[in-house]
C-alpha cells in the first residue's frame, strides 16, 4: 500500500456529486460539444449510485443530443457508467447507441474528466470534462477555433454557464489586438460576440475571459493556414466477419496550423488552429510490387473522414484469394473545393496519415458482463 493511498483512504467519504455540471467535450472529426449533465443520487447515500440526464450541442453543426444514464462511483473517485440516447453522434449502421462512461472525479468533487465511448472495440467516443456549476461564470469554449488578423465583424459563439444576461463588450476579453465590437446575443449558457482583429495582432492562442472568469477556453489568432496534419498519424481498423466479429472503424480529422515566429513548419512554435473541413481520399501505401490494397481494404467518407473497413475474405478478386487486409495512406485536402477542383491553379493544403487495416480480433478480453 502506497503512502498516497493510505492518506486518501483515511478520509474517503461517499461522493457528493448530485447537482448540475457544465459539460465540455470533443469528438474527433466533429469538434467540440458543450452542454450540461444533471446528476441525481440514488438509493443509500453510501452506495455511490447516481442517474444522469445529459444535454449537449455540437458547436460546429448545431445538433443537440439528449441522453439518460446511470453511474457507479468506486473508491470515491472512479465513475463507471452507461447511457442511452439517439444515434446522432455516431450514425453508423450496427453501432450501439448505448455508451460506456469512464471518468476520474476530482478530490474536491468540483470536476471530472474522462471518456464516453461505444463501438465493438470502444473506438468511437468523446473526451469530456465536467465542472460543477455554482454561482460564478464558467467559460467552456468556443464554436470557432480561430480568428483571422485584419478581419472585422467576425462572430464567435461562446459556451459556458452563468453568463451575464446583460453583458457588454467590456465583459469579454481576448487580449491585445482583438476588439469586441458588440454582444450579438447572450443567454446564461451561450453568448455570440462580434470581434475585429488588428492586422498586426500577435499570432497565437488567446484565453477567453468572460466577466473575469477564464478556463481552458481559447481561440487562435492567425494570418494564414500554412499546413494541416491528419490525426491520428497512425490509424488502425479491423475487417468485419459478419455478426460474430464486428468491424473496427477509424475516424480521422484534419487540424490546421500556422507557422510560428521561426517561419518553419513542424517546429515547436507552430500554432495549432483547430479542426477544418477537408476532402478525404485513400492512396496506395506501396509496400510490394503492384500493391493494390486501396482497392480492397474499405472506404473513407469524403467529407467526414470516417473509414469503414471491408469484410474479411478470402477475396477471389485478389491475388492468391488473399484477405482484404492491407495498409494505405489517408489523405486530407483543404479546402474541400480546391481538393475537388482539377484546375491547375487549385492548390489545396494536404496532409496524410498511415492506416493499417487488419483482421478481426478473434479473442475479446472484456468479460461478457462488461458489455451489458
Model features per residue range: what roles?
Residues 2-15, 68-72, 98-100, 104-141, ...:
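Edge beta-strand at a domain terminus
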Residues 170, 259-296, 344, 365-367, ...:
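Short, well-ordered beta-strand segments
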Residues 36, 126-173, 187, 214-267, ...:
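Beta-strand/beta-sandwich contexts
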Residues 15-104, 115-118, 123-124:
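Central antiparallel beta-sheet cores of small beta-barrel/beta-sandwich binding domains
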Residues 201-212, 314-345:
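A short beta-strand micro-motif common to beta-rich folds, especially ectodomain repeats
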Residues 149-213, 274-282, 288, 294-297, ...:
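Immunoglobulin-like IPT/TIG beta-sandwich domains and homologous Ig-like subdomains
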Residues 125-130, 214-225, 339-359:
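Edge beta-strands of extracellular beta-sandwich domains
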